[in-house]
């Protein structure tokens, strides 16, 4: 089984506020393609979670069931699998509407794969699935954190 993360998760070298400000400016670049917007949205969501006391354990982890955008440990010790959806407009519905029932099933399967990998075995106080939406409008991205989304 091929499990991979496309990003290492280094410790931040800047205060979270500076990271969020920098990412917010980059998200408002009108020349970005949708894939780039999505990647920056994931970075923005992870930085925001870290600013709330969360610890990023993994990002963009792949297995046969798909990709886990962000895997974090929240301050209560739960392992939280965070699906991030970033949009410029609501033309095609809200970002959270893109997390369909079939997507949720695949995310659950991917989470089991992540949890059972020997390198990820760790004590925890439970597992949860959250959705973070990032809407790039106005002067600052609008982030919405849906805890226990499914």
Swiss-Prot record:
InterPro entries: Restrct_endonuc-II-like, tRNA_endonuc-like_dom_sf, UPF0102_YraN-like. CDD domains: PoNe_Nuclease (cd20736). GO terms for molecular function: nucleic acid binding. It holds the Pfam family UPF0102. NCBIfam families: PRK12497.1-3, PRK12497.3-3, PRK14681.1, YraN family protein. Belongs to the UPF0102 family. This is UPF0102 protein BAD_0596. It comes from Bifidobacterium adolescentis (strain ATCC 15703 / DSM 20083 / NCTC 11814 / E194a).
């Amino acid at each position: 089984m091929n499990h991979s993360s496309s990003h290492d998760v280094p410790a931040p070298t800047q205060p979270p506020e500076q990271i969020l400000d920098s990412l917010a400016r980059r998200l408002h670049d009108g020349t970005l393609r949708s894939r780039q917007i999505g990647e920056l949205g994931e970075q923005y969501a992870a930085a925001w979670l870290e600013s709330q006391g969360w610890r990023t354990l993994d990002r963009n982890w792949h297995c046969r069931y798909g990709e886990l955008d962000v895997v974090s440990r929240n301050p209560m010790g739960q392992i939280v699998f965070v699906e991030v959806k970033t949009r410029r407009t609501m033309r095609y519905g809200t970002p959270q509407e893109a997390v369909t029932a079939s997507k949720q099933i695949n995310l659950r399967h991917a989470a089991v794969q992540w949890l059972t990998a020997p390198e990820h075995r760790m004590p925890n106080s439970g597992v949860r699935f959250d959705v973070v939406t990032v809407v790039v409008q106005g002067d600052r991205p609008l982030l919405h954190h849906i805890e226990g989304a499914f």
